Amino acid sequence: MAKLTKRMSVIRDKVDATKQYDITEAIALLKELATAKFVESVDVAVNLGIDARKSDQNVRGATVLPNGTGRSVRVAVFAQGANAEAAKAAGAELVGMEDLADQIKKGEMNFDVVIASPDAMRVVGQLGQVLGPRGLMPNPKVGTVTPNVAEAVKNAKAGQVRYRNDKNGIIHTTIGKVDFDTEKLKENLESLLVALKKAKPTQAKGVYIKKISLSTTMGAGVAVDQAGLTAVAN
């Protein structure tokens, strides 16, 4: 049996795996246990009452968190003409068409998000094997294929998170950094849950949001009592 590290031993002693914590208590616990030498992210896992094997029950989308994510996001945009200029004005780090595609083919991928205008997809389509596996392929369902590239750039910079359930029907994403105020983390979580409820497939039956867990980058999961969350109760 592997020996527990001192850090994991402390986490195991502090976190009751059988308990659902009030959201404020859960965040306080995460803050107490975040002892890494960097500012850890606060991540969330939401178990949804969907059948992930059925395509009409899959949940995918994007939402802008009211308090951002605490991350600096570099944006690449495929656009030309007025759209290209608008993307630059909105703060995109990389803007182009075939020239940008050539950079990516060479392995130059110094960006976190890729956005494309619809007319640029003829170029972006050639990059599916490169961008797809990295989760960077633009998609209209998450607002990264859009005629309004400037707005998409602003959203990405403002703290937009993309979400998509895994094969077990679980959404994994981030809601900020552990040094955020407790209220800001709570607001971000509530905002995400509102977006997930709006994205509920009509075919999904029974309890939709089944379980919510919070964790930090290096920490264990802490189950959250949904009774204290406005977005779930309403």
Swiss-Prot record:
Q: Which Pfam families match?
A: Ribosomal_L1
Q: Name one GO molecular function term.
A: rRNA binding
What keywords are assigned to this protein? Answer: Repressor, Ribonucleoprotein, Ribosomal protein, RNA-binding, rRNA-binding, Translation regulation, tRNA-binding
Q: One GO term of the cellular component aspect?
A: cytosolic large ribosomal subunit
Q: Which SUPFAM superfamilies match?
A: Ribosomal protein L1 (SSF56808)
Q: Name one GO biological process term.
A: regulation of translation
Q: Which family does it belong to?
A: Belongs to the universal ribosomal protein uL1 family.
Give a short account of what the protein does.
Binds directly to 23S rRNA. The L1 stalk is quite mobile in the ribosome, and is involved in E site tRNA release. Protein L1 is also a translational repressor protein, it controls the translation of the L11 operon by binding to its mRNA.
Subunit details for this protein? Answer: Part of the 50S ribosomal subunit.
Protein name as annotated:
Large ribosomal subunit protein uL1
Recorded source organism is: Enterobacter sp. (strain 638)
Q: What gene, per UniProt, encodes this protein?
A: rplA
